[in-house]
């Protein structure tokens, strides 16, 4: 088993490769202990020819299992190290003109670049299967008998010309050691090697983990630190989780971990099981490989009887599922000595990989979506001798991760925004201006004040903020921004500057301006009040701030975002008002509707099926027309705002005429700086932004190019019950003050930009050269997949935790966990559970995505959800029922857990926690009764007829204290009689459902009644851990202290109970003197405690079975069958039950011909221009 799937991504970051598929460039460092990753695609070696004996003389060195996991994880992470830096590239227009200062200028005939990507980064090939359960031996003999066993192999009859002793040892040596003479028990127990590094402690075969569920830990449990219920419940969950993670592996059988035995030779059992078979090494022990033991013929006889009755045992490769055209095997059915729970989990993993096959078109369309229009991407043909196996996430899964990730952490929005900003800046098509245009204006008395004001407003937000705001327009609005409503404390020129500033903000950032509409419109209204008080008065009287006559109360962001109040500036025709009409006309959106064509073709995650978006910067096209409607609106804003303010200032009451003359000069300078903003915004800014809209992470937007339309209702994460009182977490955070925008940024866009494409030599041409760095599709795709992976790393633990507490999931061990916890989880406990799951996933080498990073979660949010869903919510309270017009993710369910993970989790939980499971060591129910026994065995039933006893349920009222003669006496009060002498108590079956707060005096009285054999105490709800000890009856300790301990157990404790086996006695132990033939036994299990025993009592040689001998069950020896999709059935054709132990099972394995990395080579020639969408 090894590290796990990484379901939050389709692709690994690209690598540069040569035409042979080898990685070139600055490859990531490779540890000397880690095999170098090869990118070549070559024909695998054909199946090796059959030989008579291919078993080597030495077993492979047993690797440390934790190292195996980490090695597999590290090999996967080698593929995602930081890509080597790339030289900045720019591309020329078809004219072929060059420009100094740029390193590369290409043409339409540029050569192809060759790259490689791995499209299945979460497959995990391993060369060894470590089962979750293994066999453990309990000996009953000392060295005297062991020496007889040690000489056994020397007396095995065999033909050395046919089979060598070391070959027998390879196949059967481990089994012969385990099932050897002098063995008391061979039992099935959890495998410490499998769970190495999992921070699980096994006590009597029951897993314990650090406490998740704190409420059950009390001071009374202090003396039983490893035995409180919460530790066991935690242990069960962490066991099942690690089981699910570590069985998500793919066994690859190669020459190094396999061998073959000749089919022509004549073998006897057990070697005949592997005759002519290709087997997987190392061979795990099994009782069927212990056959042929001349010292214990009774064991052979028992096994022979099973084979006669139709039990079939198999080991090695049985058949080939798929093969190459040349006949080389790709996938196979192989039988191993592993438990059926592990085998069933591996079957689930194989099924998931088998049904989700690589599709070439998907990969090509994804790469094209991350390429500029006009780029060429060609996938290079893979080797026909290989077959790809792996999983690719569906758009629904990726969308689920993004939405829930956003609900769990605000870092998701910030990370997506940063990725968009970095990708935008990568193009290199816009940069900060190195010149100061305002400094070039000749100073005079009229312009110094306005220059100072503009510099002051420009200083509040620089070039990086300006670019970030541009990137925000394509980033999903997961956190809504606002603009602060300012007090009316501006006068003079500031009124003009602020009026123009707010108008320009709507032109440059239309989608952000709409979301900030409350603050911006409040500020507009205040400016109108200061510039034209009469117009403001008429507006309030005849219209009102929000269309309500006479209403001049400022609109809050909360009211605006919930559509409770909307500014009249957006919703009402104000053309009858001169200033307000001008504002309304200038802030009206301009642009065009476009669609995410490439994203739709690539089937990227999108909230809506048809994804139109508003493009505020129309592309000027290949002719590079400067006079675009966007540039015209900018110039119009400067001209008409100045003209109107001049008209309002005819008497100079607002601004002196000298200052107004200076304003005209400064505005002319600003308009000159807008000279290239038509092509600059339409192509050099607009086209990179249009490219970003097709990326995976930009999965939705809500701006429709209109100011008068209301906002959609808020998306939230809710429980499946959708009760108004259930917890809700906003996916879109609409909360004032989360992001505050500075409108002064517009002066940076006006005065502080330069477009490298426009630095042409005007004597040569006026055609702007298109210079930019083209994106590298595989690299950019890998970056976005990493973000989705980080979302998944937060979502999967959350969704697993939600699944664990789901009320609909109440079987397969979950019932036992709920009984152990006896209550619902608090918010803190649920967070603890998520944290433990997250740690387990990272510690085991499992990462849902290619990245170990996890977004920091919002600590104040209550995360307890039952089957979380995404729904629209009105006013953060009312959940709106989905309609057919809603997006599919709103109408349907989230897909958060990687396919196969929860079925494997439930398999593991059923096996270890279900009270009816033979694998589980947690037992429930005890009898306390004194009976005399000569010898005892753990599975002995209570030898009493309980029909002779009157059943009474224990309560405090059962006891009374009365004065008897001169002293107070404690006794049982039953049917009007008081019994204070234990010997006189009537025969009673006392059912104790809880011993919580049972007085010590009551416990002592019960003990005396037990001594007198008057009562039987039944503890039906008591969970306990059991172990079996083989000992002589003389050595067995008295059980009275243990009985008192059981009566004192609190509800938050689980006791350890030892059961003794005195049937199997070491004959070398001698006792002097006489001993009674019987012993008092007090503790009896209600149900069997030895279901996990494979064999018992191998304490004698010969053909006669010793007392207490128990052979393995049929199911333990029944290999059954496995179909091509991983389903395990018994020999009778019934699906194998994970609660019934089976120790021989089939698995689907792969050969070296199976491509589990999904490495794909592709050729890429980037576009040379930014002229087309």
Curated annotation (Swiss-Prot):
UniProt protein name: Inner capsid protein VP3
Compositionally biased spans, kind Basic and acidic residues: 9-21
Region (Disordered): 1-53
Compartments, record wording: Virion
Lineage, uppermost ranks: Viruses, Riboviria, Orthornavirae, Duplornaviricota, Resentoviricetes
Entry superkingdom: Viruses
Family: Belongs to the turreted BTV-fold inner capsid family.
Residue spans of biased composition, Polar residues class: 33-53
């Amino acid at each position: 088993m090894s590290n796990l799937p990484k379901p939050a991504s389709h692709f690994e970051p690209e690598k540069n490769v040569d035409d042979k598929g080898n990685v070139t460039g600055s490859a990531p460092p490779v540890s000397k202990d880690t095999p170098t990753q090869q990118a070549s695609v070559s024909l695998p070696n054909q199946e090796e020819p059959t030989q008579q004996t291919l078993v080597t003389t030495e077993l492979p060195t047993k690797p440390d299992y934790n190292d195996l996991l980490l090695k597999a994880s590290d090999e996967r992470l080698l593929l995602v190290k930081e890509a080597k830096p790339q030289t900045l590239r720019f591309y020329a227009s078809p004219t072929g003109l060059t420009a100094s200062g740029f390193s590369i200028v290409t043409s339409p005939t540029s050569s192809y670049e060759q790259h490689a990507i791995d499209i299945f980064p979460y497959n995990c090939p391993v060369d060894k299967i470590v089962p979750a359960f293994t066999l453990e031996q309990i000996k009953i003999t000392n060295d005297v008998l062991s020496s007889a066993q040690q000489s056994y192999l020397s007396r095995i009859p065999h033909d050395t010309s046919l089979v060598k002793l070391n070959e027998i040892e390879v196949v059967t040596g481990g089994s012969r050691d385990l099932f050897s003479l002098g063995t008391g028990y061979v039992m099935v127990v959890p495998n410490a090697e499998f769970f190495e590094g999992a921070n699980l402690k096994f006590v009597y075969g029951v897993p314990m983990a650090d406490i998740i569920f704190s409420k059950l830990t009390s001071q009374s449990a202090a003396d039983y630190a490893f035995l409180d219920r919460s530790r066991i419940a935690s242990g069960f969950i962490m066991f099942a989780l690690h089981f699910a993670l570590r069985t998500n592996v793919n066994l690859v059988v190669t020459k190094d971990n396999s061998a073959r035995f000749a089919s022509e030779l004549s073998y006897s059992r057990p070697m005949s099981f592997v005759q002519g078979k290709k087997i997987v090494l190392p061979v795990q022990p099994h009782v069927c490989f212990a056959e042929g033991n001349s010292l214990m013929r009774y064991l052979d006889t028992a096994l022979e009887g099973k084979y006669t009755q139709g039990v079939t045992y198999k080991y090695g490769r049985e058949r080939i599922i798929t093969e190459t055209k040349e006949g080389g095997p790709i996938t196979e059915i192989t039988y191993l000595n592993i438990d059926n729970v592990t085998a069933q989990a591996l079957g689930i993993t194989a099924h998931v990989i088998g049904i989700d096959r690589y599709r070439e078109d998907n990969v090509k369309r994804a790469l094209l979506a991350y390429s500029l229009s006009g780029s060429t991407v060609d996938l290079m043909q893979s080797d026909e001798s290989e077959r790809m196996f792996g999983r690719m996430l569906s758009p629904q899964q990726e969308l689920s991760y993004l939405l829930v990730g956003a609900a769990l952490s605000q870092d998701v929005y910030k990370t997506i925004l940063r990725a968009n900003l970095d990708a935008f800046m990568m193009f290199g098509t816009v940069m900060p201006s190195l010149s100061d245009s305002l400094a070039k204006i000749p100073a005079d008395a009229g312009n110094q004040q306005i220059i100072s004001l503009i510099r002051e407003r420009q200083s509040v937000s620089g070039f990086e903020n300006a670019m970030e705001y541009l990137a925000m327009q394509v980033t999903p609005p997961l956190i809504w921004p606002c603009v602060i409503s300012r007090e009316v404390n501006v006068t003079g020129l500031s009124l003009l500057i602020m009026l123009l500033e707010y108008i320009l903000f709507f032109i440059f950032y239309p989608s952000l301006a709409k979301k900030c509409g409350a603050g911006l419109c409040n500020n507009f209204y205040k400016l109108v009040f200061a510039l034209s008080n009469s117009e403001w008065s008429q507006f309030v009287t005849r219209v009102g701030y929000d269309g309500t006559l006479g209403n001049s109360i400022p609109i809050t962001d909360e009211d605006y975002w919930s559509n409770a109040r909307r500014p009249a500036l957006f919703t009402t025709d104000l053309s009858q008002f001169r200033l307000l009409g001008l504002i309304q006309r200038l802030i009206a959106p301009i642009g065009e509707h476009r669609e995410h064509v490439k994203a739709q073709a690539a089937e990227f995650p999108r909230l809506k099926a048809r994804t139109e978006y508003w493009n505020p910067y129309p592309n000027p096209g290949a002719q590079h027309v400067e006079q675009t409607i966007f540039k015209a609106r900018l110039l119009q804003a400067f001209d008409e705002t100045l003209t109107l303010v001049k008209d309002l200032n005819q008497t100079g009451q607002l601004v002196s005429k000298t200052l107004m003359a200076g304003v005209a000069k400064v505005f002319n300078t600003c308009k000159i700086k807008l000279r290239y903003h038509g092509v600059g915004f339409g192509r050099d800014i607009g086209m990179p932004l249009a490219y970003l809209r097709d990326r995976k992470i930009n999965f939705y937007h809500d701006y429709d190019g209109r100011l008068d339309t209301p906002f959609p209702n808020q998306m939230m994460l809710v429980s499946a019950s959708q009760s108004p009182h259930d917890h809700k977490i906003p996916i879109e955070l609409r909360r004032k003050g989360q992001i505050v925008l500075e409108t002064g940024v517009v002066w940076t866009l006006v005065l502080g930009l330069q477009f490298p494409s426009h630095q042409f030599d005007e004597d040569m041409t006026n055609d702007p050269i298109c210079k930019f760095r083209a994106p590298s599709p595989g690299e950019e795709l890998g970056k976005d997949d990493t973000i989705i992976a980080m979302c998944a790393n937060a979502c999967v633990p959350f969704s697993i935790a939600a699944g664990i507490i789901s009320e609909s999931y109440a079987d397969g061990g979950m019932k036992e966990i709920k009984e152990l916890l006896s209550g619902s989880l608090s918010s803190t406990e649920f967070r603890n559970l998520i944290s433990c799951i997250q740690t387990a996933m990272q510690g085991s080498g499992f990462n849902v995505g290619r990245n170990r990073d996890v977004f920091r979660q919002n600590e104040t949010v209550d995360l307890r959800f039952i089957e979380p869903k995404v729904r629209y919510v009105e006013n953060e309270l009312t959940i709106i029922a989905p309609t057919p017009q809603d997006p599919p993710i709103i109408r349907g369910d989230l897909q958060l857990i990687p396919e196969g993970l929860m079925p494997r989790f439930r398999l593991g939980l059923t096996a270890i926690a279900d009270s009816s499971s033979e694998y589980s060591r947690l037992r429930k129910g005890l009898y306390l009764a004194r009976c005399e026994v000569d010898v005892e065995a753990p599975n002995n039933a209570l030898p009493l007829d309980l029909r002779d006893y009157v059943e009474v349920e224990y309560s405090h009222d059962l006891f009374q204290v009365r004065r008897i003669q001169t002293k107070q006496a404690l006794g049982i009060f039953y049917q009007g009689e008081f019994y204070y002498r234990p010997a006189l108590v009537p025969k009673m079956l006392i059912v104790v459902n809880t011993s919580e707060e049972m007085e010590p005096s009551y416990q002592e009285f019960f003990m005396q009644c037990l001594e007198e054999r008057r009562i039987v105490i039944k503890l039906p709800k008591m969970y306990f851990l059991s172990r079996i000890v083989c000992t002589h009856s003389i050595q067995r300790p008295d059980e009275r202290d243990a009985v008192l301990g059981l009566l004192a157990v609190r509800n938050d404790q689980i006791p350890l109970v030892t059961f003794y086996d005195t049937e199997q006695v070491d004959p070398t132990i001698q006792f002097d003197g006489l001993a009674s033939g019987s012993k008092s036994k007090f503790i009896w299990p209600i149900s069997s405690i030895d279901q996990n025993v494979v064999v018992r009592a191998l304490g004698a040689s010969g053909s006669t079975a010793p007392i207490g001998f128990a052979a393995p069950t049929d199911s333990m020896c029944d290999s059954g069958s496995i179909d091509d999709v991983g389903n395990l059935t018994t020999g009778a054709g019934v699906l194998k039950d994970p609660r019934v132990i089976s120790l021989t099972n089939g698995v689907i394995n792969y050969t070296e011909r199976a491509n589990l990395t999904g490495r794909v080579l592709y050729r890429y020639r980037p576009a040379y221009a930014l002229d087309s969408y």
